[in-house]
Structures are given as C-alpha cells and as structure tokens.
Amino acid sequence: PLEEIIFFNFACSLYQGLNLIKKSNIWDFFDYNIEDIFQAWSAGCILQGDYINSISQKYKNYKNLNFEFLHSLIEEKCSKKFKLIREFNSNGIRSGLPCPVLSSNLAYYDLIFSNHKIGETIQLQRSFFGLHTIKNKKDDKKIKPYWTKL
C-alpha cells in the first residue's frame, strides 16, 4: 500500500495548499489561477508530475476545490487500502518513527469526512467535567451520565 500512502498524503497536502492559495485570492494583490498552479507544479519530479497531472484532470471535471473533490480523489485510489494506511501510521508511531504528515493528513481527512466531529469530542469533555446531559444519536434520548462510575 506504499503507493496509496504516498498518494493519500500528496492529495490531502495538495488540497490543503490549493485551498490556502484559493482563499488568498480574496485580497486584491493575489490573483492566482488554480489551473496555472497545476501547470507550474507539474514540471516537478516525474512522480510528482504524474500525481499532479491526474489530480489536475480531475479538477478540470469538478472546477471546484470542495470536499467532494478531495473525497473523489482519495476514494478512487485509496478506499480499499484505508485500513492499511491507518495501520502503517499506527505501526510507525508504535515503533518510535514519527509520521507527522501522514498523522496530520489522516486527522484532517477524518475531521472532514468522519461522522464524529471534533465538536462532539469537545462537548463530551465538557459533559465529563460539567455533568451536562448528552443526546443519544440513535434515539434522541437525553442521558445525564455520571462519568466516574462508567
């Protein structure tokens, strides 16, 4: 799954970078065209050029840097290997080999596409310390847990 790991990292990092560039266009002194950036970056190394060219083709179909674009990129190449990508990251960390880019990209991907958002985690921590009620997602029933007895 090494190729999928590299592609996953490349796609997530590229997507985040392109979004930063796109957002910078709100200021008058920046006026970047995403297609021009793809063209300039594709002149890099062969591997990078191949990845950028395939992502650039997909961008031409979408014409939008939205989450659907990122999801389609990763699903196409990595969906069947996602468990292995996570295991690779976990094994690296357990072995004392930091994988900061992969860890960060997995967290970014999960933040966007997971059913469990960071806000839920924060609320759970608030509930733990403040004993607030929580709502069960399955039946909308409110529960007032006493966390220290769980």
Language-model-derived ranges and their functions:
Residues 1-95, 99:
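C-terminal substrate-binding/catalytic lobe of Rossmann-fold NAD(P)-dependent dehydrogenases
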Residues 79, 84-150:
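C-terminal amphipathic alpha-helical interaction region
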